[in-house]
Amino acid sequence: MNRFLLLMSLYLLGSARGTSSQPNELSGSIDHQTSVQQLPGEFFSLENPSDAEALYETSSGLNTLSEHGSSEHGSSKHTVAEHTSGEHAESEHASGEPAATEHAEGEHTVGEQPSGEQPSGEHLSGEQPLSELESGEQPSDEQPSGEHGSGEQPSGEQASGEQPSGEHASGEQASGAPISSTSTGTILNCYTCAYMNDQGKCLRGEGTCITQNSQQCMLKKIFEGGKLQFMVQGCENMCPSMNLFSHGTRMQIICCRNQSFCNKI
């Protein structure tokens, strides 16, 4: 009996540590051992019926223990499986919560980014009127310059107004031209003077010159401060009638033909 109980205890320990397939195999081996032990049991039952009944009760108790052990092993495995699945579910739930928090943080970040960009957009839109204002101020700066240019234009008109005076002098030349046309090819003795006072008196370089071809007798009057200072007369090939101004000094050029002295004071 002690040996049989020892074998059953070893079986229960093996069934608790083995897989689900091992208890079935071990139960088959125990049944085989039980059938083997039943032979001495029958032998014992021949000798002593009370021993056979005790052996039967012991075998039925061992079978009950084996079933209880296998059921406890299955329930323990089921409990471990449920515990593992519960931990897995909790781990998934825990891993799902950071993802949810990250998703929420991502939504919060995405929500904040447009709000951060909106002031910058408003700032740019606020700067745009400044650029437009600067562009608007630039034409206003250019407008006075245009007005200044328009103000300078009358001075140009004034210069153009002076031009008719030259035309008037050229008109005098034209009036003298018919006279020269009648005497083309004639020789004219022109009075020359290097320095003549305002009274028409030659003070230096007095003489005569002969006009040839297109030469004319020319008189130069020099004025300073609006007052006649001196005069110069001689023969010149090119004789334009005009007024020249330079640093407060004015020079009047008078051209004449068929006259020995152009000064008419």
UniProtKB/Swiss-Prot annotation:
Q: Where in the cell is it found?
A: Cytoplasmic vesicle, Secretory vesicle, Acrosome
- Which residues carry attached sugars according to the database record? 258
Question: What GO terms describe the biological role, i.e. biological process, of this protein?
Answer: spermatogenesis
* Domain of life (superkingdom): Eukaryota
Which residue ranges have biased composition labelled Basic and acidic residues? 69-110
Which residue intervals correspond to the sequence repeats?
66-70, 71-75, 85-88, 91-95, 110-114, 115-119, 120-123, 125-129, 135-139, 140-144, 145-148, 150-154, 155-159, 160-164, 165-168, 170-174
Q: Where is this region: 3 X 5 AA repeats of S-E-H-[GA]-S?
A: 66-95
GO CC field: acrosomal vesicle
Ranges of compositional bias, category Polar residues: 152-163
Which intervals of the chain are annotated as region 9 X 5 AA repeats of [SV]-G-E-Q-[PSA]?
110-174
Q: Keywords assigned by UniProt?
A: Cytoplasmic vesicle, Glycoprotein, Repeat, Signal
Secretion signal: which residues?
1-21
Annotated InterPro entries: Acrosomal_SP-10-like, LY6_UPA_recep-like
Where are the annotated segments for Disordered?
62-181
Per its record, how is this protein called by name?
A: Acrosomal protein SP-10
Q: Which organism is it from?
A: Homo sapiens
**Which gene underlies this protein?**
ACRV1
